[in-house]
Amino acid sequence: MPLSRLIINNFRNLQSLDLELSPNFNFIVGHNGSGKTSLLEAIFYLGHGRSFKSHISNRIIHYQAEDFVLHARIDEGQHQWSVGIQKKRSGDTLLKINGEDGNKISDLAHLLPMQVITPEGLTLLNGGPTFRRAFLDWGLFHQYTEFYSCWANLKRLLKQRNAALHQVRSYAELKPWDIELAKLAEIVSQMRASYAEALRPEIEKTCQFFLPELEIGVSFHQGWEKGTDYAEILAQGFERDKAMGYTMIGPQKADFRFRANGLPVEDVLSRGQLKLLMCVLRLAQGEYLVAQKERQCLFLIDDFASELDPIKRELLAHRLRESGSQVFVTAITKDQLNQMQWQESEQDSLFQVQQGMLTK
């Protein structure tokens, strides 16, 4: 679902922008600090209700303003949506879809599936399991309508159980939580396992295209020993969990691991190879969504040239163009975009950014 128009007011140093966007490639060129990454951040915020750079909203609002406002028009065939979000310094958030209040961030996220590729995105590979669970859960959110409610209820029950561990004296007092928790844990873990298995050949095939010199393997770990009863594990671990003050084993510990030639990728790959593998994972997941759901996936790529050699840049650009996705790419100079053939397509848009102002 491409964005055809984007309006930004008081988002970081972007005080007032109204942009008509290409459904194909949108290139944003400017020096560091000019505001090009802030443009990607604003698009990401529209689709997630949060930033990929800061968890503190007041740092995102322009220093002379009391709020920021983002508005976009989404086009898909004969359908069109108008979406908007306002964030105030007080913390209040107003979200509208087609002029109507009462929507949730998850409603916006369903309308705007997007993948973001940034220099900080290597945490997907060298960070903790949290980042890789988020990777899996993004795909599940867009793949299965029932996943979000199961996942949200699971998080709620885990939070309640952890709080109860500080209060209960015997396991009998905790058991009602565990009955429901075990059911949801099994459901969510089965969804994760099925999705991981379906995505695995897509990842391996895409890795072969970009990294033929490496044998990349992927594996899903549900967070407790496979083939065992999670309800029994909760019961047996009660005293340990109570002593620690939280639930130590379960779906909140799940992981999606990547190995290169049999070894953990973070131990054997160079930083450039890790960057390329991260791009491959995002691309494979976005392409899988398009194939399964026949929906477009937006790609936000910050600092395109960073740590990718010209050949790999050209391969990535080729695959993105083949996918038919809407892509937003930032670069410091136009020369860094040469592998994207930006001069050759009249349907692409190129924006120059300087001190928060954009010109075509």
Swiss-Prot record:
Sites where the protein binds ATP: 30-37
Key words, A-Z: ATP-binding, Cytoplasm, DNA damage, DNA repair, DNA replication, DNA-binding, Nucleotide-binding, SOS response
GO cellular component, one term: cytoplasm
Subcellular location: Cytoplasm
Family annotation (InterPro entries): DNA-binding_RecF, DNA-binding_RecF_CS, P-loop_NTPase, RecF/RecN/SMC_N, RecF_2
Pfam families with a match to the protein in the record: SMC_N
Principal location class: cytoplasm
Manganese found in the keyword field: no
GO BP term, example: DNA synthesis involved in DNA repair
Record GO terms (molecular function): ATP binding; single-stranded DNA binding
Family the UniProt entry places it in: Belongs to the RecF family.
PANTHER family: DNA REPLICATION AND REPAIR PROTEIN RECF (PTHR32182:SF0)
Function: The RecF protein is involved in DNA metabolism; it is required for DNA replication and normal SOS inducibility. RecF binds preferentially to single-stranded, linear DNA. It also seems to bind ATP.
Annotated protein name in UniProt: DNA replication and repair protein RecF
Source species of the chain: Actinobacillus pleuropneumoniae serotype 7 (strain AP76)
